[in-house]
Amino acid sequence: MSYDLLIRGCRIIDGESAPAYRADVGIQDGIISAIGPLPDAEAERVLDCPELILSPGFIDIHTHTDFTILINPRAESKIRQGVTTEVIGNCGSSAAPLCGEKLVRVREQNKDLVIDWKTLGEYCERVNIQGTAVNLIPLTGHGNIRSSVMGYDPRPPGREEMNRMLELLRQSLEEGSRGISTGLVYPPGVFSGSDELVELLSEVSRFGGIYSTHMRNESDRVEEAVEEAINLAEKAGVSLQISHLKAQGRRNWHRIESCFRKIEAARSRGMDIHCDRYPYIASATDLDILLPSWTWEGGSEEELRRLSEPTIRKRIRDEITKDDWESVIISRVATEKNRKLEGRNLKDIAADRRLEPVDCLFDILMEEELEVEALFFGMSRDNLERILKKPYCMIASDASAQADYGLLSRGKPHPRTFGTFPRVLGKLVRRGVLPLEAAVYKMTGMPAEKLGLKDRGVIREGAAADLVIFNQAKVK
């Protein structure tokens, strides 16, 4: 038999939690055609891999590559980690649908791109015309739907608005979306209530999709947030994915045990519920996450106006209780004049400016017109390992595809951008936190099952040949 590619003598981890075994693999037309001893096989290309491991390509179930893939379709920060499939559209924000205020805001935030689509179908056509190094599985951002219909108003939708939101969601699901995501700490998701969300989730359930949620709280009220996520999904009868499970802040580390109990109780009732996590103890998001949610009402222009008014600044200052400003590190700014702030913490920046850290926060947000990203330390390493060990936890980067050159090399991104999967396979597996087969399953077969992918995430005859070869002793 002749193949396009023959991989000889590799140690196979099949993505289904089975023990590793040694075999040859023959690949033809992008499909795994044969697995086993193939001593007489020929191929256009032969790889002899007796010291290496062959696994399914990794499925990154929580990413933000929606727009960066159009800047650089090579997705190098993902491909170099072994990622072959990404789930985009997380945390309530996706590339589509884009209407009304959402379209205006996305164009403002992505000046390096021509945003010439409005629907998911049009976005997918744009990506396919350009090409992409990774498979992309889209979710529909609840924030897109809500802001497309009713902007950033802090109120429940009226019946006509709700119907329009359902129409936009239904169209996206018909055009290939695998479900919906929420970002309930971000505008406009923070303004949404349970009735609105259950109605949308019920529509997703009818399509057999999933609900991925950046919960309403990940610190002082994380237990309530887990309960809310479970209740919403249970009422709607939809599969639940809790994004980047954590208990942020030392005073909340003990709360993770209660979160586990709630998740496991729901699973024991038959709920399809999982979570994901990156292998680091710092998170990353927009700097204005530190502001009270009412400052976001009405959109970015209103937020900047509030920051410019002394009396409102005082009110905001009085509501911010943060004191560990050294744990907040600026990772990316928009202007050249503040580039020197990247990689530095707010406490030190404030000292240089002879300001209180909270006033320094306000000034930086205004100088950058809110376009500031930051890293936030405050998670427990012990909790991290306990989360990753859970049989319902997958590995995810929570990062967009980046590069070390060009437009995507700006700033000092979270190391998860380039290091999530190697860190698990190298550091955590070698330390015995996870067995190798279990770690690979969390990156391959488990997310494939969650997403209903039949031909990805596994090594079996007839499956797509999205594969990764790595040296377990050296991966880092």
Could you describe each region identified by the protein language model?
Residues 10, 30, 51, 62, ...:
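Divalent metal-coordination and catalytic microenvironments
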Residues 124-127, 133-135, 139-149, 155-159, ...:
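Active-site neighborhoods of metal-dependent hydrolases
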Residues 41, 49-115, 219:
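Metal-associated gating/positioning segment near the N- to mid-region
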Residues 2-57, 476:
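Histidine-rich, glycine-flanked metal-binding segment
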Residues 12-24, 372-378, 383-384, 432-440, ...:
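Acidic, glycine-enriched loop/beta-strand segments at the rims
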Residues 91-98, 106-235:
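Hydrophobic, small-residue-rich alpha-helical packing segments that form membrane-like cores
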